[in-house]
Amino acid sequence: MPLTLSHQQTDGDAVIALDGELDLASAPDLAELAGELVRNGAGNIIVDAQRLSFCDSSGLRILVSIANDLRPVGGRVSIVNPQPVVLRVLELTGLDRTVMIDWDPPQAG
């Protein structure tokens, strides 16, 4: 299933909603969008993973890269509402200790 990205940005926060599979084919799209949002002033990026059905190592690498890009400006990446299969991957790889995992509805601003 291809990945669909949507986003909104308010003040210092941006929400990126992911729908589908984050994998080798789609990870560059997320990287490009996140890079654009950071260049446009996003200090924090909230990834709405409610509809993310799969994430492979390419997707994980992009999430770590986004977190590293935000660190110098004091920002962070939060992943909200991950599906159990995605949460398990985050836990197995230790990424749940690098990014914040939350269960609240995402809001920019």
Question: Where is each model-derived feature located?
Answer:
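STAS-like cytosolic regulatory interaction modules
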Residues: 1-54, 64-109
